[in-house]
Amino acid sequence: MTNKLKKMLKFPCTFTYKVIGLAQPELTNNIIKIIQNHIPGDYAPQIKSSNKGTYLSISITICAKNFKQIKNLYNELSKIHLVRMVL
């Protein structure tokens, strides 16, 4: 999958992460903080709540300079204790 993704992307490019995690106020802030550390900028994440309000789906788009940047962000976002899945 990684090789296919590398071949499909031409850098720099926009790349959207969808992060699904527990519905806690600090989740969005933690996601933005990690992204700001790698790629400073203004971000406007789209946030959707699950039907029961247990989870949040947060979509955030970045401008990636290379594949390593995409992979590193994916790994760091996955380490947030409230995160259940990163797409």
From Swiss-Prot:
Gene3D superfamilies with a match to the protein in the record: 3.30.70.260
CC annotations in GO: cytosol
Disulfide cysteine pairs (residue numbers): none
Coiled coil: none
Pfam family, one: DUF493
InterPro entries: UPF0250_YbeD-like, YbeD-like_sf
Family: Belongs to the UPF0250 family.
Protein name: UPF0250 protein BCc_307
Species for this entry: Buchnera aphidicola subsp. Cinara cedri (strain Cc)
